[in-house]
């Protein structure tokens, strides 16, 4: 099958996709080959490119459907075609989009879906099964596996560990990643704060943790039992890093809420305040190639690993530095600078809030592409940004309320010019 046919086979299974997200969805195809495949498909009239939500999207055309059916009919059986060509709208469509986006991100990060490698969660929890042996030997000590929400529900029902009501709530959980570093609960909020009920999510997380803790695998394998005993952690997947201040403030514009008592809608949205009632640690990754790398780091590196990564960066990029422990985080003073430097190899929401609450100003080192979302979250105390190659990065300046202080935002028409000191 040619690269163009692989592209069409994938587009056949979905309604449409952002053009730039194809590199994530088809991560096994080299970038240049994918670009050429798209160009050829457009030339042949097999795909259509259109604008949606201010970005280019791509979908298969009727000619493309006819072509791929003729060349790949053995793999595109009639039942699969009927299911994949069905067009979903409303909340059901958004849920499917969240699952597809999360699945693509995990595949690109080297985290396979359990159902795609033929491992069942219910079988994995029994130590004398082949699925358990395969999981422990091939995946547990690596990046782990992604178990989607429908399989979690089926396992809860099959084990009878908790009541069936734990599977029928309107939880927004997409799935969980299990590896030797912990259990990560994945949510996909796309480009806006989605509805998120604390009681539903708490009940769901408790039910999943209970079936894992009470399993044969937990009782007979110390490493698996250790993972089950760790604190709950969530990974929030959003369209861009502009979602970071929105999640932290609970405001759809990312502005600080001045009167929380009148912000009742946020009580039922995916916000950090609500997340912290269920999860001890909450992380964010955007849906792009940078997000793939951040997702991989988030689920494979402990806080000690991250602090070692920071220490290694300092050794390579600075002449002299002094590290200070601040809770479990690392702060540093570089080359006798009076202002501290914060280094963010991943985006942990609690760390951003903790550092913003401090009194000192700071320089920030982070991945290129995350700086504007972090700048809006951190506010007045940010001095400047550098990327992980120690190169300066431009970023808008914001005050502590999340309002631009270096000009007017052309989209929201809010902001001001700060007077020079």
Annotated model-derived regions:
Residues 186, 191-194, 202, 206-208, ...:
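Long, compositionally biased intrinsically disordered regions
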Residues 10-16:
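Short helix-capping/hinge SLiMs at alpha-helix to coil transitions
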Residues 39, 49-74:
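Accessory beta->alpha helical hairpin/"wing" motif in late/C-terminal subdomains of nucleic-acid enzymes
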Residues 27-44:
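Short amphipathic alpha-helical interaction segments
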Residues 84-202, 206-209, 213:
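Exposed, interaction-prone assembly regions rather than primary DNA-binding/catalytic cores
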Residues 16-26:
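Short acidic, hydrophobic short linear motifs in intrinsically disordered regions
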Residues 63-93:
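Short, amphipathic alpha-helical interaction segments positioned at domain boundaries
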Residues 3-8:
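Short alpha-helical "packing" element that flanks the helix-turn-helix/winged-helix DNA-binding module
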């Amino acid at each position: 099958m040619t690269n163009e046919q692989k592209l069409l086979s994938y587009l056949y299974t979905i309604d449409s996709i952002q053009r730039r997200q194809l590199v994530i969805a088809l991560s096994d195809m080299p970038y240049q080959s994918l670009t050429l495949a798209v160009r050829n498909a457009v030339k042949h009239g097999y795909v259509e490119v259109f604008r949606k939500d201010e970005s280019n999207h791509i979908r298969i055309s009727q000619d493309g459907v006819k072509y791929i059916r003729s060349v790949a009919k053995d793999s595109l059986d009639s039942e699969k075609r009927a299911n994949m060509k069905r067009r979903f709208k409303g909340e059901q469509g958004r849920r499917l989009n969240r699952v597809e986006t999360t699945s693509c991100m995990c595949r690109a990060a080297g985290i396979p879906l359990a159902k795609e490698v033929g491992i069942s969660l219910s079988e994995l929890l029994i130590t004398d099964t082949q699925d358990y042996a395969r999981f422990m030997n091939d995946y547990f000590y690596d990046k782990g596996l992604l178990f989607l929400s429908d399989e979690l529900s089926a396992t809860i029902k099959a084990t009878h560990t908790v009541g069936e009501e734990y599977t029928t709530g309107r939880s927004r959980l997409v799935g969980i990643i299990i590896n030797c570093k912990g259990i990560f609960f994945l949510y996909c909020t796309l480009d806006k704060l989605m509805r998120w009920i604390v009681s539903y999510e708490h009940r769901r997380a408790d039910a999943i943790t209970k079936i894992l803790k009470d399993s044969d695998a937990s009782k007979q394998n110390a490493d698996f039992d250790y993972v089950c005993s760790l604190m709950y952690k969530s990974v929030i997947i959003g369209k861009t890093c502009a979602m970071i201040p929105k999640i932290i403030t609970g405001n759809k514009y990312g502005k600080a809420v001045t009167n929380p008592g009148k912000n009742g809608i946020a009580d039922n949205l995916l916000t950090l305040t609500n997340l912290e009632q269920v999860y001890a640690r909450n992380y964010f990754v955007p849906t792009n190639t940078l997000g793939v790398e951040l997702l991989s780091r988030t689920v494979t590196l402990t806080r000690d690993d991250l602090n070692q990564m920071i220490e290694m960066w300092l050794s390579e990029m600075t002449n002299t530095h002094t590290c200070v422990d601040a809770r479990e985080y690392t702060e540093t003073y570089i080359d006798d600078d009076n202002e501290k430097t914060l280094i963010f190899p991943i985006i942990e929401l609690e760390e951003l809030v903790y550092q913003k609450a401090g009194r000192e100003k700071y320089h920030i080192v982070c991945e290129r592409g995350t700086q504007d979302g972090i700048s809006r979250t951190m506010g007045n105390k940010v001095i400047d940004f550098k990327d992980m190659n120690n190169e300066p990065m431009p970023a808008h300046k914001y005050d502590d309320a999340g309002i631009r202080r270096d000009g007017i935002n052309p989209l929201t028409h809010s902001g001001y010019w700060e007077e020079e000191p």
